[in-house]
């Protein structure tokens, strides 16, 4: 029984997901349905958390929009995600960057990771 579930989940995994880590800045293009129209909407932010659970993997992006912090959780293998682009690689030493919620301005900056 579990082999059937694993096989079905394996078929639904996306193959074109780039590798990224917490601290990286991503641009995620998402399909949005408004009435009868479908359009792409971009969300660019810093990865503050990643949840590795196979087909149920997710990541959280945070950005500041008009002075207000906005966080959005994306399911990594969701069909509404059109593309994920890594814009900038950040150098951090923690897996969860929840401390960025309390910071603003220059203290919320993340150094750029050079090299790999």
From Swiss-Prot:
UniProt entry keywords in alphabetical sequence: Ribonucleoprotein, Ribosomal protein
Q: Which GO terms describe its cellular component?
A: cytosolic large ribosomal subunit
GO function terms (MF aspect):
structural constituent of ribosome
Recorded hits in PROSITE patterns, A to Z, give: RIBOSOMAL_L19
One Pfam family linked to the record: Ribosomal_L19
What are the recorded Gene Ontology BP terms?
translation
Task of the protein? This protein is located at the 30S-50S ribosomal subunit interface and may play a role in the structure and function of the aminoacyl-tRNA binding site.
The family line of this record is:
Belongs to the bacterial ribosomal protein bL19 family.
Query: What's the protein name?
Result: Large ribosomal subunit protein bL19
Species the sequence originates in? Histophilus somni (strain 2336)
